[in-house]
């Protein structure tokens, strides 16, 4: 039997997690024939995800039913599929239908997105505010990797879905003297836009994978698996136009949290950079979006060049939003998301998958630049996975895989 049938994708792993730790954890479920942590081909730094191959493929069923924590970090596990299998699934219409068929299922989450955070807010203050709604299991404030400046947004995880419902009784909260916006964070497979139409590769559609164009999954907590819930069904470009491989923790390419125009301008990111800023009233073009045009002032009294619901919100203004994360001050969470955007626009760069142009998986679709026959244009990039032959199982919730090929931007 082909050993690749027992292949598991593991995302959101700590930078400190190596192959030995990966193998040690999953050996509890069965014999591990191979464990791989993907690394940046230029810097050698871990990319925050990897793969495990079990000798007995039947082990995967049990692994996928449980939650996993390695080096105190909750990781995301999905069945890996070959490109051929992915394409067959796409042709037969089985792309995540059980997970994106509508109804209330996609609203069920224990995580929220919080935008417009004060720049001086600490993790502890962040946690204390939301603990009044229920026990908090994790918090993360996003930072710019290059400057260590807070990006103005973060995530809070509760131990119950009811706590999220309580928080969302109002959209705006007063936190440390500043009004912040709260939204439900959803797994990218939960597509409120309806069905599998939004999951194709390329264009501006699909919940397509974590990733950016260069460094990769350097986010420090599992919130990199989530994106904001929104009611617009147009495109939802999602976690990465460039695949899982790069979106976490590379430079600031001006993209970020959203293809919706995002919370920031076109070149800086959430509160960082000359043309962006999540409410920097003295910055022209700041606010929610990067697309041009006059927009109403946002909740932070910021002249937004695009604005929530204005041009760019849910449209092709994919390269904007919350930019990059990165190292954080010692007292705060070092987590962060990709240089190209987390969520609506996706964690991802504009031109590659695992740092290339095909990447790990446009569901049944082709990558935007280069195909699977181009060297380094697909797959897991490095370590024998550069042939673009594998993707994540869409039925496991990755929507279009880890790459959108150019749509989204998407994490």
From Swiss-Prot:
Ranges of Polar residues composition bias in the record: 87-101
Residue span, RRM domain: 6-82, 110-187
Biased composition, class Gly residues, residue ranges: 192-212, 362-387, 397-411
Keyword terms: Cytoplasm, mRNA processing, mRNA splicing, mRNA transport, Nucleus, Repeat, Ribonucleoprotein, RNA-binding, Spliceosome, Transport
Alphabetized GO MF terms: mRNA binding
Transmembrane segments: none
GO BP, sorted A to Z: mRNA processing; mRNA transport; regulation of response to salt stress; regulation of response to water deprivation; RNA splicing; vegetative to reproductive phase transition of meristem
Region span, Disordered: 81-103, 183-221, 358-411
Segments of this protein annotated with the region Nuclear targeting sequence (M9): 341-390
Example of a GO cellular component annotation carried by this entry: cytosol
One Pfam family per UniProt: RRM_1
Subcellular location per the Swiss-Prot or TrEMBL entry: Nucleus; Cytoplasm
PANTHER family: HETEROGENEOUS NUCLEAR RIBONUCLEOPROTEIN 1, RNA-BINDING REGION RNP-1 DOMAIN-CONTAINING PROTEIN
UniProt subunit comment: Component of the spliceosome. Interacts with TRN1.
Function field: Involved with pre-mRNA processing. Forms complexes (ribonucleosomes) with at least 20 other different hnRNP and heterogeneous nuclear RNA in the nucleus. Involved in the packaging of pre-mRNA into hnRNP particles, transport of poly(A) mRNA from the nucleus to the cytoplasm and may modulate splice site selection.
Protein name according to UniProt: Heterogeneous nuclear ribonucleoprotein 1
Organism of derivation: Arabidopsis thaliana (Mouse-ear cress)
The gene coding this protein: RNP1
């Amino acid at each position: 039997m082909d050993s690749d049938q027992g292949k598991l994708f593991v995302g959101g792993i700590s930078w400190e997690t190596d192959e030995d730790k990966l193998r040690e954890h999953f050996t509890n479920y069965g014999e591990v024939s191979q464990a791989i942590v993907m690394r940046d081909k230029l810097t050698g730094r871990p990319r925050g995800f990897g793969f495990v191959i079990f000798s007995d493929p039947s082990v995967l069923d049990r692994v996928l039913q449980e939650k996993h924590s390695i080096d105190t970090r909750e990781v995301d596990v999905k069945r890996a599929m070959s490109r051929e299998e992915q394409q067959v699934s796409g042709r037969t219409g089985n792309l995540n239908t059980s997970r994106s068929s509508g109804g209330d299922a996609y609203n069920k989450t224990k995580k929220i997105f919080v935008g417009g955070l004060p720049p001086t807010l600490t993790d502890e203050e962040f946690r204390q505010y939301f603990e009044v709604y229920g026990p908090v299991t994790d918090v993360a404030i996003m930072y710019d990797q290059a400057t260590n400046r807070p990006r103005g947004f973060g995530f809070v995880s509760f131990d119950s879905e009811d706590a999220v419902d309580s928080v969302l009784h109002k959209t705006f909260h007063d936190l440390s003297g500043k009004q912040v916006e709260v939204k439900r964070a959803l797994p990218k497979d939960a597509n409120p836009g309806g069905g599998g139409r939004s999951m194709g590769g390329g264009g501006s559609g699909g919940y397509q994978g974590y990733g950016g164009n260069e460094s990769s999954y350097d986010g420090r907590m599992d919130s990199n698996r989530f994106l904001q819930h929104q009611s617009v069904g147009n495109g939802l470009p999602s976690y990465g136009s460039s695949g899982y491989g790069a979106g976490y923790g590379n430079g600031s390419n001006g993209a970020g949290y959203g293809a919706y125009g995002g919370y920031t301008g076109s070149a800086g990111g959430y509160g960082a950079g000359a043309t962006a800023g999540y409410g920097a009233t003295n910055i022209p073009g700041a606010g929610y979006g990067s697309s041009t045009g006059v927009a109403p002032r946002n909740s932070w009294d910021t002249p937004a060049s695009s604005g929530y619901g204005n041009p760019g919100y849910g449209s092709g203004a994919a390269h904007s939003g919350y930019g990059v994360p990165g190292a954080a001050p010692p007292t705060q969470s070092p987590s962060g998301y990709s240089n190209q955007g987390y969520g609506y626009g996706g964690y991802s760069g504009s031109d590659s998958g695992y740092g290339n142009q095909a990447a790990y998986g446009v569901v049944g679709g082709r990558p935007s630049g280069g195909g699977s026959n181009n060297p380094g244009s697909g797959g897991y990039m490095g370590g024998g996975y550069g042939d673009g032959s594998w993707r994540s199982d869409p039925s496991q919730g990755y929507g279009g895989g880890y790459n959108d090929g150019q749509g989204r931007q998407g994490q």
